[in-house]
């Protein structure tokens, strides 16, 4: 068994960081005040502590490199044997955002790492995937490219008020868009492969399956590893109703052979709204069917109302409180959607955007004792460790906050925890997010409802105005902005915006909310004029106030209306 490495430290034994390590790892600690080491045998949460013996490893790109030898000092930690050779220190199943981040960070810390991924495809399946994962290949990136494409029709319409005239009506070629989009995806997956290669991460193509806590099978080839990371993401979910075989999901919607003429989109979440905006902008007839009264469950109520109204003004038809019951194919090839309220006919496509499920099927996790939720999500602790000490999970497969930047954060934190002796919890405070609907949404922090529940005394500032650009275009576009402030501390608890450039604007305010800035800090900040963003630093009087004992939910007579509107 490898000897326990000695950590010479000038940190006091009362240091929280040192106390954490002492609780989690078997360490021989040398402190300045101690003349001899004391060995601490401790529980299993972290898997390994490492000696610094050099090792030469041969990777798939045939380059040799020297790395630190990471050997588990106590087999009771994660079951790995300290004197046994393992092919890798970390084997990751899934080369999406979280898996790639964890793998390349691991090698930068001196560990050996491999990642396996299915062959490239724009549509995921049990046999196809691709390096880059959902975000790069069938999520954030291709969707945003289609959002850009769809916005041009609005720009053409806007431009008339600014003097632009067109001899012919602009037309759109769907085939060109999809071909160019797919070429960009091929370029991006190549970049990701290059990143892995440069980081000395071995990339293995194939489907990975966990055989035991330290063994992975990739299409019949066996690899041993000290730690396994599951980062396989999720897949679109279509409910089991008659005619479901006629439905498309978000993967297919990004890669259709032809543009829809009339499309039914079932779902009221961000994916449904984003695709509704895309197809509406590309001059398709769009109908959105939602089970609830409003779209975007979980978002701020004012934002939910505002975005629904604005999208309706652009010609999208919302069918509220309707549940899908069946899809019926007509003799002419068109589809009808039967709902709890009736039947709507004549659709060229029926799309379901009814959520995503963790992609944990056929990974062998049940056989090794990994605990999962009813929806298939892998249950993890605050350090992303599963119920099996040597198996970890990050990203959408854990169903925590299903955002690409969050998966990146989780992957980086895991690598630090395992291979840098730096136990790191992902920080989920004040995570900003965006919905690329049209108009788009940017939000960070608490909703009004959450703030009232958690703090009681809350001041709400809102502004609903016509942006400068719309004054000449003559279009009904408006912008909604909202600040939620703790009345007792003056701390800004939430920032919400719906309108052009909201996602770009919210990133900066995400820093402000994370830093704990106050409304006074906002008020003391000079605005940039003329911009929509300056509204966030010029809203002086609250629209309404809420107090624990009594609610003043009425509009303030001093409520601010945007200047110049």
Swiss-Prot record:
Binds 1 FAD per subunit. Glutathione binds at residues 97, 192. The gene is EMB2360. Its EC number is 1.8.1.7. NADP(+) binds at residues 268, 271, 274, 291, 297, 355, 434. This is Glutathione reductase, chloroplastic. GO terms for cellular component: chloroplast; chloroplast stroma; cytosol; mitochondrion. GO terms for biological process: cell redox homeostasis; glutathione metabolic process. Its cofactor is FAD. Disulfide bonds join 135-140. GO terms for molecular function: ATP binding; copper ion binding; flavin adenine dinucleotide binding; glutathione-disulfide reductase (NADPH) activity; NADP binding. The keyword DNA-binding does not apply. The active site is a redox-active disulfide bond. Residues 544-565 are annotated as: Disordered.
